[in-house]
Amino acid sequence: MDRRNFIIAGAAAIACGYGVGIALPKTRADELYLRPPGAVKNFESLCIKCGQCVQVCPYHSIDLLDIAQGYSNGTSYIDANKRGCYLCDLFPCVLACPSGALSHDTKVIGDVKMGVAILVDANACLAFKGESVSESGVKNLLDRKIYNDREQAVKDSIKVKIGSICDLCASLCPVGESAIIIQGNLPLIKQGCVGCGVCAEVCPPQVIKIVPNKTYDEIY
């Protein structure tokens, strides 16, 4: 059984658990989890836990929450520190969603409002310290299994930065300079940030985090 089928089968098994008296904690999932692009405000109630968005994501960015996440289990989310959202053309995850949990009005990057990035430890930032990207620092990214040309392109973009002063967060951002730039040897998050999480994924010291369901104005 491959990874995606395992996830979906697990979600089905979890759903069955409701019928046998499993007590699940309530959570504020809308505040805790980074959802795929196009997620509506009442995402948790509309998501039918079908896993279609997981199956079609070419970057393998989307997973399903497990039973430890309470009533949110089986719903789709993105762990940006493992794999951000690369904001694909046509948003296949949105097109695959049958329930309206991901709004089909999401057609261009400007429609996406997943959250906003924050720098949590400037002193550990490689750019701030004037340090180069090392092969060991991005080993986890380069060792990741590749399934398609898009993922290979990401790996190649990371590999060419080895030996250069780190600007991975800015150079790999799918939004571009309207979202993040390096200014004064530090990442500067700008109003164009949509919270895709790519900067968090590729940051070697993991000092960028995503605040889900918040806007730039709410954070900055």
Predicted regions and their residues:
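Non-ligating segments of multi-cofactor redox enzymes
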Residues: M1-Y220
